[in-house]
Amino acid sequence: MSHPSMIRGALAWSLLGFGLNAAAQTPALFKDADLKLGEKLIAQHKCNQCHAQKWTDDGKAIYRPKGRVNTPALLQGMVERCSTQLNLSLFPEEVTAMAAVLNRDHYRFTQ
């Protein structure tokens, strides 16, 4: 029978490995993005609510696997397009932060 501290240690190493693996798979475009800022801006500008009104399936239909957005650069461009259309006046690093969060949570581009 394994000792509880050994199990916790193995779990910690496994989570650490997952975190390193996830960071290694982040596209170069989003490598230095401020994810906390992206989360804050997505909530502040009510992006999820806006998309839920415009798309079926609570706004998640836009994240279909073979949609028009199929690269990190196109994802960043779509966030920039929303910013322009809605006159949000986002700075480039804010657009990148928001796109990085969308990539992490929905698109999962690795390159």
What are these regions (language model features)?
Residues 32, 69-73, 89-93:
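Soluble non-cytosolic domains of exported or imported proteins
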Residues 45:
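Cys/His-enriched microdomains
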Residues 35-40, 48-84:
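Gly/Gly-Pro-rich "capping" loops immediately C-terminal to redox-active cysteine motifs
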Residues 5, 66-67, 94:
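Solvent-exposed, flexible loop/coil residues
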Residues 88-111:
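C-terminal capping alpha-helices of c-type cytochrome domains
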Residues 23-42, 84-87:
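Electrostatic cytochrome c docking/interface patches
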Residues 1-32, 109-111:
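N-terminal export/targeting leaders of redox proteins
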